[in-house]
Amino acid sequence: MASFLSRLPQGKVVAALIVLLLVVDQVIKIWVKTTMVLGQSHVVAPWFQIHFVENPGMAFGIELGSKLFLSLFRIVAMGFCIYLLAKLVRKREHTLAFLSCLSLIIAGGIGNIIDSIFYGVIFSGSHGQIAQLFPSGGGYETWFHGRVVDMFYFPLIEGVFPSWLPFWGGEEFVFFHPVFNFADSCISIGLILLLVCYPRTVSLLLDGKKTLPEGTTEDSEPTKRE
């Protein structure tokens, strides 16, 4: 498979990857919206639930500023990322694996942007009822004010803080508490892989350098020239 992909144009591979991830993300979200009531849970395992929540903020439910500002910020950020990816693909100086990491981040960002822009218009509300797709009475919000659909919940560790602990003593805690979606996973995995596997390449790009130093490969020591 790796050798087959290496023979394909990088642009087509990363474009196909982004489209595939977007389809998976939206299929999951639409399934949740059209089969579950807000707050409903399906217990898959003691440590994993499909728990339907919506958030107006960023990844993992983080909120920052107004909804319209967040939507516009996402669009600008993803526009820059797409421009950067297209530029790197044209230069043909980076591996497909590196470009795929960027594609994960872009696909995740676009997936949540779709929720923010369209979901408020194409879905009815999910409070106390299953949402309808393209309701006759209109959606639950206006353009750019849709809420992001989250569903993956991993309560891996549950317990109670020791009573002697300041501030939180005696309170219950859950790890991992945030509820997230497939798009959030793509963003997180892409970022982690970039930072762990390609720190030098990322550093050079952030410094505005277009290429790696001569005699080096991505995140390798300089190669000895015979």
Swiss-Prot record:
Alphabetized InterPro entries for the sequence: Peptidase_A8
EC id: 3.4.23.36
Keyword terms of this UniProt record: Aspartyl protease, Cell inner membrane, Cell membrane, Hydrolase, Membrane, Protease, Transmembrane, Transmembrane helix
GO BP field: proteolysis
Catalytic residues, chain numbering: D150, D184
Transmembrane domains' residue ranges: 12-32, 69-89, 103-123, 173-193
A single GO molecular function term of this UniProt record: aspartic-type endopeptidase activity
Domain of life: Bacteria
Recorded topology in the membrane: Multi-pass membrane protein
The keyword ATP-binding appears for this protein: no
Major location category of this protein: membrane
GO cellular component assignments: plasma membrane
Reactions accelerated catalytically: Release of signal peptides from bacterial membrane prolipoproteins. Hydrolyzes -Xaa-Yaa-Zaa-|-(S,diacylglyceryl)Cys-, in which Xaa is hydrophobic (preferably Leu), and Yaa (Ala or Ser) and Zaa (Gly or Ala) have small, neutral side chains
Amino-acid biosynthesis as UniProt keyword: no
Location in or out of the cell: Cell inner membrane
Annotated pathway: Protein modification; lipoprotein biosynthesis (signal peptide cleavage)
Function description: This protein specifically catalyzes the removal of signal peptides from prolipoproteins.
Family note: Belongs to the peptidase A8 family.
UniProt protein name: Lipoprotein signal peptidase
Species name: Porphyromonas gingivalis (strain ATCC BAA-308 / W83)
Gene giving rise to this polypeptide: lspA
